[in-house]
């Protein structure tokens, strides 16, 4: 007998920026950018919907964002606050199912297949969750409801912000057929271009290719796309998902104090970290810089983006932002390190369009 799964994907709307607008009424309705200082080689962690109208997006250099919208308000992230709010949201989700899989601070899958809440209706549960998040946390969330993780995630992005989309087995084929290939989960600029070159622009175009043909063009990720195009995704909601990190550090032969020299070394470290991410089929949201001084004391500085990254160029944009806020106190440095955490399995190994630095 076929399992009747009911999966909800909850995605908070412009999470960090929305928290700042909630806590600071003067920011409401204004283009707000959470991230680094545009005068210090910063990077955008996230931005409000008012800022997005100007073409600003996560992982964009702050200087570029400033040029697009000079009147934008730039503020530093308050990660401890965001983590606290995230726990509030996750606590609400856990009241509806013991199968909750957080993907990051601002999104999670919820398997309500066996839930008796709201008469067992996944749609009503999703609406109730959205209402509770708004009343209890003061933020909006978008929800996708479907019979597997791929479709639930695609659905949550369909009517942002503060929307809900339900994809049933009956309407799933039509939804997938019309879905632009660049919107498919994990399809980035490079994969999109490869598929466009063979005449694939929407989900329906994928149906004209066999699994073998897609694997020949895209490797293992061709199999994933073949299945996604047919509404197939058998991945389970995993509440025990282990958060791991990937990092590299170098102890220097001689202590240094020149920032440009540090940047050169960090660039090499970022390259090794990026290679490891690719080899392990991973992407991450949090970039952490570690600096150990010649008195053996060390500090770390982190930034968490809204979207996942793996490329060296993207990592270095964050690292340059982080090193700009380190107070060296005239001390020399003996060790440098970079760690990427909040990892997601990179099902299709390509950078996503919104993470491109080609601005």
Curated annotation (Swiss-Prot):
Domain named UmuC: residues: 7-188
A GO BP entry: DNA-templated DNA replication
Residues binding Mg(2+), per UniProt: 11, 106
Keyword Hydrolase carried by entry: no
PROSITE patterns per UniProt: UMUC
Cofactor note: Binds 2 magnesium ions per subunit.
Gene3D superfamilies: 3.30.70.270, 3.40.1170.60, 5' to 3' exonuclease, C-terminal subdomain (1.10.150.20), DNA polymerase, Y-family, little finger domain (3.30.1490.100)
Classification via InterPro entries: DNA/RNA_pol_sf, DNA_pol_Y-fam_lit_finger_sf, DNA_pol_Y-fam_little_finger, DNA_polymerase-Y, DNApol_IV, Rev_trsase/Diguanyl_cyclase, UmuC
First-listed, main subcellular location of the protein, grouped into a coarse class: cytoplasm
GO MF assignments: damaged DNA binding; DNA-directed DNA polymerase activity; magnesium ion binding
Subcellular localization, as worded in the UniProt entry: Cytoplasm
KW Protein biosynthesis (keyword) present: no
Catalytic residues, chain numbering: 107
Membrane-crossing residue ranges in chain numbering: none
Pfam families linked to this entry: IMS, IMS_C
GO cellular component term of the entry, any: cytosol
Cofactor(s) this protein cannot do without: Mg(2+)
Similarity field: Belongs to the DNA polymerase type-Y family.
The protein's assembly and partners: Monomer.
Listed name of the protein: DNA polymerase IV
Lineage, opening ranks: Bacteria, Bacillati, Bacillota, Clostridia, Eubacteriales
Gene: dinB
């Amino acid at each position: 007998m076929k399992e009747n799964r009911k999966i909800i994907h909850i995605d908070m709307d412009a999470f960090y920026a929305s928290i700042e607008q909630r806590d600071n009424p003067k920011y409401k309705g204004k283009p707000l950018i959470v991230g680094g200082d545009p005068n210090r080689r910063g990077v955008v962690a996230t931005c409000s919907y008012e800022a997005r109208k100007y073409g600003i997006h996560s992982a964009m250099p702050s200087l570029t964002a400033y040029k697009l919208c000079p009147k934008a308000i730039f503020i530093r992230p308050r990660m401890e606050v965001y983590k606290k709010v995230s726990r509030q949201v996750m606590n609400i989700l856990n009241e509806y199912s013991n199968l909750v899989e957080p993907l990051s601070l601002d999104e999670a899958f919820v398997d309500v297949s066996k839930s008796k809440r709201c008469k067992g209706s996944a749609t009503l549960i999703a609406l109730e969750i959205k209402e509770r998040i708004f009343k209890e946390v003061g933020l909006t969330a978008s929800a996708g409801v479907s019979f597997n993780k791929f479709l639930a995630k695609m659905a949550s992005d369909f009517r942002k912000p503060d929307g809900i989309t339900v994809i049933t087995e009956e309407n799933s084929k039509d939804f997938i057929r019309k879905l632009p290939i660049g919107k498919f989960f994990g399809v980035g600029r490079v994969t999109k271009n490869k598929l466009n070159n063979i005449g694939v622009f929407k989900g329906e175009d994928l149906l004209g290719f066999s699994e073998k043909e897609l694997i020949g063009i895209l490797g293992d990720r061709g199999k994933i796309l073949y299945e996604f195009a047919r509404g197939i995704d058998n991945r389970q909601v995993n509440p025990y998902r282990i958060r791991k990190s990937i990092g590299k550090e170098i102890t220097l032969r001689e202590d240094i104090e020149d920032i440009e020299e540090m940047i050169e070394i960090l660039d090499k470290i970022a390259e090794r970290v990026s290679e490891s991410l690719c080899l392990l089929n991973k992407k991450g949201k949090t970039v952490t810089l570690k600096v150990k001084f010649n008195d053996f004391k060390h500090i770390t500085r982190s930034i968490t983006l809204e979207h996942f990254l793996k490329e060296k160029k993207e990592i270095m944009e964050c690292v340059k932002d982080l090193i700009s806020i380190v107070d060296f106190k005239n001390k020399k440095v003996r060790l440098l390190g970079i760690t990427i955490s909040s990892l997601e399995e990179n099902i299709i190994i390509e950078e996503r369009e919104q993470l491109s630095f080609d601005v």
